[in-house]
Amino acid sequence: PIEDNELLEALNQGALLVRNPSARLAWSEVDEDLLLFASGNSRLLSGHLRELLRNICAADALHVENLQPWLSDDEGRKLLCELIKQGSLEFADE
């Protein structure tokens, strides 16, 4: 599993996160929260991650510039690490 500091270090060194071609990602609003569906798993997230989920679900590749607002957010970093761990996101060189 990837840790927060490893994620930040890799992205700051120019690594690119890409969606696994077989990953299925979608999200829905639930009151003020968000429900993320990722490769057969679901997770309830706070509403402030709405734009991050839009980026993750819509983009094939995520640059550090696209992720910067959420890299300083504990929940945002944790989500990215979990999506890498489950194989929905991966580094482009893998």
Functional labels for PLM-detected ranges:
Residues 52-71:
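Short acidic, hydrophobic short linear motifs in intrinsically disordered regions
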Residues 1-57, 81, 92-94:
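Acidic, low-complexity/disordered tracts enriched in E/D and polar residues
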